[in-house]
């Protein structure tokens, strides 16, 4: 799993050939925290 920012998003996601799963996460987001074990 990668942690991306504005500088690396285009290179790692938009320019990658193939499929990419992007998970948007926010600190303190209860549904986000509930999904983490499954996504990771």
Swiss-Prot record:
SUPFAM superfamilies assigned: Thioredoxin-like
Record's keyword annotation contains Disulfide bond: yes
Domain of life according to the entry: Bacteria
Pfam families for this protein: Thioredoxin
Alphabetized UniProt keyword annotations: Disulfide bond, Electron transport, Redox-active center, Transport
Keyword ATP-binding: no
Annotated InterPro entries: Thioredoxin-like_sf, Thioredoxin_CS, Thioredoxin_domain
Cystine crosslinks: 29-32
Family the UniProt entry places it in: Belongs to the thioredoxin family.
Task performed by this protein: Participates in various redox reactions through the reversible oxidation of its active center dithiol to a disulfide and catalyzes dithiol-disulfide exchange reactions.
Full protein name: Thioredoxin
Organism from which the protein derives: Clostridium sporogenes
């Amino acid at each position: 799993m990668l942690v991306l920012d504005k500088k690396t998003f285009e290179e790692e996601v938009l320019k990658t050939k193939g499929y990419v799963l992007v998970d948007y996460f926010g600190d303190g987001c209860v549904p986000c925290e509930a999904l983490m074990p499954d996504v990771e």
